[in-house]
Amino acid sequence: MAKKHAGADANDSDYNEEPNFEDPPGFVDTISDEDLLGDMLAQRPSEADGVESVVVVDNIPKVEPVRLEKLKSVINKLFSHCGDIVNVVYPVDEEGKTKGYAFMEYKHASQAEDAVKKLNNHRLDKNHTFAVNLFTDFQKYENIPEKWEPPTIQTFKVQSDLYNFINDPDAYDQYCVAAETAPNCVQVGFWQNTLPEPSELETRERFTDTFVKWSPLGTYVVTFHKPGVAIWGGSNFQKIQKFPHPGTQFVEFSPCENYLVTYGPTPTGQKIIIWDIRTGAEKRSFVADGMSVLSMFRWSHDDKFVARMGENSIHIYETPSFYLLDLKSIKIPGIRGFSWSPTDNVIAYWVEEQNQIPARVTLMEIPKKREIRNKNLFHVADCKLHWQKSGDYLCVKVDRYSKLKKDKKELDVKFLGMFYNFEIFHMREKEIPVDSVEIRELILAFAWEPIGNKFSIIHGEPNSSNVSFYEVNKGVKPSLVKRLEKKSCTHLFWSPRGQFIVMANLTMGTFEFVDSTNDYIISASPDHFRASEVEWDPTGRYVVTGVSSWKVKEDTGFNMYTFQGRIIKRTILKNFVQFLWRPRPPTLLAEEKQKEIKKNLKKYYAVFEQKDRLRLTRASKELLEKRAQLRETFMEYRNKRIAEWKDQKSRRVMLRGHVDTDNLETEEVDEEIVEFLVKEEITLLE
């Protein structure tokens, strides 16, 4: 056995002795368990009384025993969508009649919470709207203190004027330019299109993660972030409201800017949420089905209704309750598409061919649900609905076939001998007459003149297409007024004020500016290589073409032109993302006043020309002042350096062997000429 080293017992006793962590007598701990172990205490198992998964449903119909089973089946089916129901109790009175409320127990508490969220305020019929609450809420409200304490008065915050951008005396338009400075980090600059040079209003670093979007009337600009989206406005673009919807990919404003729709997944499974812009409250949410997620909803022009297409139906919701119109959907078997009129509460939809029944385009008046016009169509493969901005006309582009080929299982359908029709509905005329225009060539693009009675189409082969312009008049068939042949364009962009149009090839980056009132003469044909977007300003005076970094990585930026195609400004901007003009709200002037101004426009010319001259004079004066300031700065710098050079003369003479080289006489200089051969040429003389 090994011997212990001397002093080993003492060392062992030192290591085996437990340290004393007890508080000294009289010690008072000032740190609570919640502050010290808050994260662990939050995970501590809590006592449950077994009612967390129970909901109370009020305002159910009061029925006799003979109708009770039917009531149970309807309500149980509705509430079973939220989870597994373990137990249901419908209290009854002495006569066996229900008392107007029920208790439902779910398998999990989360399912009960989901039922409260989805079915509270659900309308069963005209007389019964559910009030759904958790059973535990009764205990919570029982513990409300009897003594009422008034809420803390919050300081009034003066909101910035959201419409100051339309108060500019010279009516200059605004625009924003976005550029990506880092991944998921976009800088946005706001500018005013002043003359002779644009004026910068505000520049925000890290303003959005992806891109921005203006509201339809230009009041707000929306930015995208991981937690959701935010809207900004006012003179300095302050944050007006934020909407928590993680992963939002796309947003839509209602036409009157009362509501915002966000599209994107969330942890709770909600993909589409409708928000109240002024309060920030969630009005209703939907889960996307197998149909397209983006732009599922269509708004009426006055924000009174919003609609979406379902399977063989249209769901129309009333605002602000967002209940279904008349508490039921409109059943339309075979519906394939629909669209609202931009100026009236009229829906246009089309139905595909079914069982030897022809396809049909229908105009329906809302909220009466009255069909005001029908048009049957034969041999239809597809339809596209195009409303004119003023709501005067509806054009239905019909893709028709001469022959239909199906396989044995009728799963694969091929359309042969394709040709195309334009069905023009005259919305402002009695009984809404319909004219038809047939085109035998492939239709590549269609565009209405926003204010006017013309539409344009691109047709033919993609590499050698034609552009045709049609005019629609009352009582006569639409007439072809001009055809421009062999034009390699892919898109048509009308001015918001009509008359002028840009024919663009967004593959090659070529553009042609056309005046539709001057025999469709091409006034200019500029190029902007790799341009991917075209933006008209709201007044129709300027056009911007842009090369986005989403498409290419080199030579990104934008060009600005007049409505006649004359280049005004070229801007090269690294990682340029998008250019957006700020929309303008409709004018508040009555139509009679507008006509009066147009009639007397000549007398305003002198005032406008005088303003232009003053502006140019002011700009010239500012330029001269700027040049004079630059010259003064240079002369100040020059005189400073000359004085410094003179102060260093003694040092300079000493370093040069006491020879003053600043004032050398020409007699003291020896001139030496050196000649050398630079080039030799041999020329043969005949």
From Swiss-Prot:
Domain RRM, first and last residues per copy: 53-137
Described purpose of this protein according to its UniProt entry: RNA-binding component of the eukaryotic translation initiation factor 3 (eIF-3) complex, which is involved in protein synthesis of a specialized repertoire of mRNAs and, together with other initiation factors, stimulates binding of mRNA and methionyl-tRNAi to the 40S ribosome. The eIF-3 complex specifically targets and initiates translation of a subset of mRNAs involved in cell proliferation.
Localization: Cytoplasm
Coiled-coil annotated spans: 590-642
Self-association and partners: Component of the eukaryotic translation initiation factor 3 (eIF-3) complex. The eIF-3 complex interacts with pix. Interacts with mxt.
One GO CC term on file: eukaryotic 48S preinitiation complex
WD repeats: 203-242, 289-327, 330-365, 438-480, 526-571
Designated name of the protein: Eukaryotic translation initiation factor 3 subunit B
One Gene Ontology MF term: translation initiation factor activity
Family under the similarity heading: Belongs to the eIF-3 subunit B family.
Bias-annotated ranges (Acidic residues): 11-21
SMART domains from the UniProt entry: RRM
Gene3D superfamilies the UniProt entry points to: 3.30.70.330, YVTN repeat-like/Quinoprotein amine dehydrogenase
SUPFAM superfamilies: DPP6 N-terminal domain-like (SSF82171), RNA-binding domain, RBD (SSF54928)
Species for this entry: Drosophila ananassae
Annotated keywords: Coiled coil, Cytoplasm, Initiation factor, Protein biosynthesis, Repeat, RNA-binding, WD repeat
